Amino acid sequence: VPEEVLKPYADGEQTPSDIPAFLSVAAGYEILHNLRASVEYHFFDDKHAGMLNDRQKTLKHGTHEYLAGIEWDIIKELTISGGFQKTNYGLSNDFQTDTSFYCSSYSLGFGARVNFNESWSIDVAYFWTNYDDYTKTTESYNNTGVKGTDVYSRTNKVFGLSLNYHF
């Protein structure tokens, strides 16, 4: 393995990964007394946050996130909700590596709350993220002189359950 590949992981090595500037704009609206909706926009200025070997400079743009959600109190004891998120990274072939890659995505989430009384409730939720495949083709795969392709892909599914006490 070439030394430059392992250098970031050497004992005592410091790897910069600055927190980017962040802009968030959100609006919520109560459509009815028991029905609420919200939209949000997030921008992460990843392109100007310091990363190892100035990796941020290979991004095409910062990260854009678009979100929307709705919440409905069906009855006093039951609330359901749903939401959507679209994340768009400014990816490039030079940014993606085998040890650190990103994929643009969209997410769907659904949830419910059951209120037992004024103090106790239970929440249940499911969240699914579908990541876009990112295909990276190189003329010299891992410096072998042979053309090669990597497909970066993943998926994420989360189930949540909580028992809540309000005091």
Mark where each language-model region is.
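Transmembrane beta-barrel strands of outer-membrane/channel proteins
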Residues: V1, V39-F43, G82-K86, V124-W128
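Extracellular loop and loop/strand-boundary signature of outer-membrane beta-barrel proteins
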Residues: P8-Q14, L52-K57, N93-S100, G145-V151
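Residues that define the transmembrane beta-barrel architecture of outer-membrane proteins
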Residues: I19-L23, K60-Y66, S104-L108, T155-F159
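Membrane-embedded beta-strands of outer-membrane beta-barrel proteins
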Residues: V25-A27, V39, A68, L108-F110, ...
